[in-house]
């Protein structure tokens, strides 16, 4: 008996010790599962709180804790990094899914025996095995949808890669440059934490080492890189903004030389203005885009650290506005006086981006060769999966579409439904949503199909809401009654969705709470469910309904029916040689000025001066800003701003500033250089291919975003380049890269004058780097040369509108 009593006492002591040690372990390692779930709910944006059950977040926290316990680096990750960069499910504005579990099961054995840095590289190889780059629309696919599709734009690739890294317990975050300074467009990539330090990598674009990607050079010319960190984060980085849901931090110091500008805002008497909004704007896509927005403190001050280039400061308070160009690295203290004057009627501004800087990490030839071998193998795995897809537009979602077409009774309207939703919808839409949109009506009119039949309202994740609303709102017989229902029942929360995530329409109905965008999506979704044509106006973002041949704006505050008070604007432009038909977002944009702030009019990407503005376009009455810009090969931009007021018929002169400088010889390249011709498999000289005269030489990389962009930009000018008639020689650096390239994707879109080949032993690349004094081997590189060995144009790295830049040079030759 004594022995039994002794054993019982010992067991109690052991259990007590286990409990105490468990508590100490939890204190050292972090918090309990419920504490992490509570942390998520404390800072969770409203749509995530309403659209997903608590069990979803509990499961994902369990998976995070499992990865922490099972991965060899789990105990080395500090609590701050684990809490903010592993536990959160959301990366960007994607639809949340169960990728953490799927990815962990696929990756855990692949990375278990590796160091943390090697594990990051290995995860990126896995990502490349499944996903490559291809542009798409603004809605961000979920990680599992991207996996199913096998491609995505950079925002989707980086969301996918961050999700994969977090699944195995590696802290990771998506880094975004909201806009490049030296060219149009933006970019997103990944930072991952290992052994006490953050490293960057190109998502789904594996390199042999960390801190290396095609964007190194572009990033060195960047002016702002940021990331939104879930919750109240207290790391060492500069804080740009704190909201109820996230902390936005500035990480530009990791990529480029920086400087700080301190801003003081004063009133007419020179007294500091508290609470003035100061927007830091970067020229991109033919507008001054706000990359940072700050409020002045009690002393009227704020600041920003950025790359050493030009921005436009735009300060507003109570309708008063002041703008001023600043140069980071030159200007240190800037005072903006809100003196009651509005924007100047017209002004010319020259914007200069930062220069190239920075050094690339060392990569041995052996490392590069092994990485190329692995990438070729990974390409083959992905292509084998893609070969199973019978319909390109449906990608990996083809079984869902086939099921729908087999089950639907109204075949004609089923085909119309598939034609009015986006291509991205076809790739990830669920069977439930398709069946929810079945109709017994046969109406193929544009109004019905686009604004009643289609479930797509904006950039929201599609859900099966129509049958739900027909049941719940069956008492509503007029669209005016639906507006009244929204007015009386839906409250607006302006604080708990700062990212403007799209709240599901059924959640809005259940919660009776959302933000302005959520209310608009809800209204349109409910209206279509009840048979009322409705939309969100793609230009000004206002919700509208269609009645009696007229579109009416929805006003949740007023009872009366209001059609838009429209006037006609005509842009008077005299075409010049290089810009016979300026393009929206490339050469010009229009913004409406509301309380001193510029609100961009979001016309379709294909909008042009001749097609949309030459003969007049209807706009609401008010004050507007016309921005035009001419971007030079150096990245510098010649900007013109024109402010005007619309009332009745209004004509505004449209000005494109020109750079009339003739092409100059800037270097040399031996036209007798040999390359391996892709078609003949023979070595040939450039001269023997091009004949005497000018030609274009491009050194490109397979399946990389900068090259893909460049080739697509060139394709826009296919006809003009064929009329020019000169050859364009496009070379890969080696045969491995040439074999990895998807010729089928580009051959039909490029000019017939294109010749493909491989640089023999890298001789041409070496000469280009030396002769053009290029500091890095970033690709692509495009040159305009002649066979007398003269180079008159050179552009390296990531750029937008390359085709236009080449044509400008060609027309001057």
Protein language model regions, located:
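Short active-site neighborhood of thiol/selenol oxidoreductases, capturing the structured segment around
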Residues: 686-710, 714, 727-731
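Hydrophobic/aromatic-rich core segments of domains that either
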Residues: 105, 109-115, 119-125, 134-144, ...
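A short, hydrophobic beta-strand/beta-hairpin element that forms part of a small beta-sheet core
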Residues: 778-796
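Short, acidic Ser/Thr/Gly-rich low-complexity loop/linker segments typical of extracellular
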Residues: 284-305, 595-613
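Short, internal strand/loop/helix patches
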Residues: 744-779
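Secondary-structure boundary elements
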Residues: 29-149, 185, 369-371, 375-511
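Short, ordered, surface-exposed loop/turn motifs in non-cytosolic proteins
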Residues: 268-287, 308-309, 576-604
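Short Pro-Gly-centered beta-turn/loop motif in secreted/extracellular proteins
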Residues: 301-312, 317-320, 326-329, 607-634, ...
